[in-house]
Amino acid sequence: MIKKKRWRLCKGDQEKENILIRELGVNPIVAKLMVNRHIDVDEGRQFLQGTLSDLLDPFTLKDMDVAVSLVLETIESHKPIVIYGDYDVDGITATSVLYRFLKKLGADVTYYIPERQSEGYGLNLEALEHLIERGTALVITVDCGISSYDIVEAVRDRIDMIITDHHTAPDMIPRAKAVINHKQKDCPYKDKNLSGVGVAFKLCQALWLTKHGEWYLDDLDIVALGTVADVVPLVGENRIIVKSGLEKMNREPNLGIKKLIDVAGLHERTITSGHIGFTLAPRLNAAGRVTHATRAVELLVTDDEDIVEAIAEELNETNRERQELERNIHELARVDVANQGHKADYVTIVAGEEWHPGVIGIVASRLVEEFYKPTLVISIHDGVGKGSCRSIDGFNIYDALKSCEDILLQFGGHAAAAGFSIDANRIDELRERLTKYCKAVITDEEYIPVVAIDAELPVDDIDVDIIDRVSDLEPYGMANSTPVFAIMEATVQDIMLMGQLKNHCKIIFETSNGTLDAIAWNSPDLFKFIFVGTVVKVAFSLQKNEWQGMVSPQLMIQAIEPLTEEPIKLSTEGLRQMYVIIKQSMRGRSQSVYNVEQDILRRKPADQNNRSALTSIDVFKELGIVEEYTSDDGQLMLRWNAIEGKLDLVTSVTFLTYSV
């Protein structure tokens, strides 16, 4: 069935919208979107017209003057510097930007990124001891270090350290030579939303300003890449950086980014923040998840085109491996959920031996999308489970774990995502306790996802011009989400599945001017509920579809519901007719589910509606006549089973439910 969603339409404020229209000259739909994002005239002027000259003075960051003096002194003394990074895209890009910059200043600089599985996130004492033994004079952290008080304390007398980080600052700040973090309580820096690469970039700016008396604006495309990937609010400085970085990415990108764009098949596209988040960043992230993040840094700091091209291809292949690992674990997890039955009604908890810990967080996110419940995915190794958690709106997964801290080995995180470890023999106990916790805390309504809609649009008003006007709000991201619109009544002219695995759905709507295309990713089940002539309401974002020189609007479906649903009615005679059709369609061989469904819709008897005809497949699966499975290439298939003797329809739950 189509997953139910709560449709929430933003109320807007006509008076505020009129002020924005009058003062800023924006289109009414843009004014409505700005009001929905709580942007007033002053903020709106900066939001729409902000430039690189509006970036803040880096020296208003606490300890920046100390850090600049120490870095320049170390360079002038020809002493070795090590950048200590992190394995996610923010850490990779922060390492790359600072490394490239310090090389320009003539520094003796290298970088160190911990291995995800064996070392984990952040500073570790063993690595620092190794750097000290190598004769390192100065360590500069990027995207980490703010919570490493004890580790810094253990080495501070033997090595100079500068911490640059953007994570929430604890009460005990490490006693490094300098700590640059805009979230420190006594830091006067006005913008509190910088990413790790953003903080590293501010250090570069301060150093360049001291050396050359001008703004440093190189590598903005790399800074933009890390900023978008880390899902920080795209307002203030972040918006300016990403907007300028995207311009550079589309005009004259870093060689590594260019090759990454090429292998991702985006070389003919205008790169947007969406392309960064969904296509480029995962390829960099794959290195840290599956192999080692240093390869991603090498991609961004190497100038040899042949080497960079080879690394880009390698990262692309690593990403395929990551996708395959993720796909396999996801499928095993789905089977686990199905086998749990009602045990999975309130919280999704799945576990498997030797599941790759680098991808369990992604799998957890996919399971939340699928089942919309707080989700824990656990990889078991040597009797210990390492878990990754993702939550639903309004539910604090960290608090949920804290309620079970007595049976956890360790845990950490925040409201939306967390991690933990546990003895494998206590996973069932964890499931029982979290089920009880979720049952008490989460309401039935909160288990239904919300689709927030900015504005209604009549189907006949959608054209390329409105997309161009709305694009003034780009780049989109956290705190400036992609606008979502709704058509409250549209008629389906055609519907089809697309993609190699037939797992995406294309719908064509009727308009007074012709037709309007829409895409629903990973929604093959729509084919069973929406048909030619179905009248629906649909929530969507807008994008341009460019094909053979033609540009047209395209809807990217967020939610869709039929305004009326065909009733399912099953009869013995109707199923007999469908048995003949399906048998002829399959011809005793395996066929893709999509091909069989298409054949059913073409050949069904006139007295059966579409849903009833397609539901016959479920009856025949329950009777063992056909068997559903996934092919080696990931396609959903049906296998015909030759069964002798008479079958009893009352053994089919589906038939008993819908029989007339």
Task: Give a label for each model feature.
Residues 166-167, 182, 356, 414, ...:
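Histidine-centered active-site/metal-ligand motif
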Residues 87-91, 144, 166-167, 182, ...:
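Generic detector of well-ordered alpha-helical packing
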Residues 2, 10-137, 158, 208-429, ...:
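Hydrophobic helix-and-loop "lid/oligomerization" segment in the mid-to-C-terminal part
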Residues 142-194:
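Histidine/acidic-residue-rich, glycine-tolerant segments that coordinate divalent metal ions
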Residues 174-228:
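Short alpha-helices
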